[in-house]
Design a protein with these regions (language model features):
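Extreme N-terminal, non-catalytic leader segments
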Residues: 1-15, 52, 134, 139, ...
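Hydrophobic/basic alpha-helical segments enriched in Actinobacteria
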Residues: 6, 11-21, 48-61, 118
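Conserved nucleotide-sensing/catalytic segment adjacent to the nucleotide-binding pocket
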Residues: 36, 40-93
């Protein structure tokens, strides 16, 4: 098992989207916007990853399961899910406007597509969903749910 810190993950359509970036970069804000659009929280500020032989499964860490920080509100509890990791978005204000192809990133021995991603605009959740659909790993045949 691998534990990633300072990352947030959500499940969309049965696949996990991992969001990384420095503190205050908008990871939780993007996750909340995606949750508002129907995604489920996997983990905020930490995510467990387990290789199940076919995919890398992202799941909530037990010590913060279901908890997410909402700036200016506090810590709230939300429903959680687990899902195969399909895409990593790295929040970067200097992300190129038109990335040609996602880079491949090896996490716990599994190659995962990774994209730089400009944070903070009004449609970032919609852009993240399109990035997952366009660049993410295909949906594996696993028992993971959204």
């Amino acid at each position: 098992m691998t534990v990633l810190a300072n990352v947030t993950a959500v499940a969309i359509g049965g696949r996990a989207l991992l969001i990384e970036g420095p503190p205050g970069s908008g990871k939780s804000s993007l996750a909340l916007a995606l949750i508002d659009r129907g995604a489920l929280l996997i983990g905020d500020d930490a995510v467990h990853l387990v290789h199940d032989g076919a995919a890398l499964i992202a799941s909530p860490p037990p010590n913060t399961c279901g908890l997410i920080e909402i700036r200016n509100v506090g810590i709230v509890e939300l429903p959680v899910s687990s899902a195969p990791l399909a895409l990593v978005l790295t929040l970067d204000p200097d992300a190129p406007r038109f990335p040609l192809d996602p880079a491949m990133r090896t996490i716990a021995g599994v190659d995962i597509p990774s994209l730089p991603f400009a944070p903070g605009d009004a449609v970032q959740a919609l852009r993240a969903e399109y990035a997952l659909a366009h660049h993410g790993l295909p949906f594996p045949n696993s028992g993971a749910t959204q």
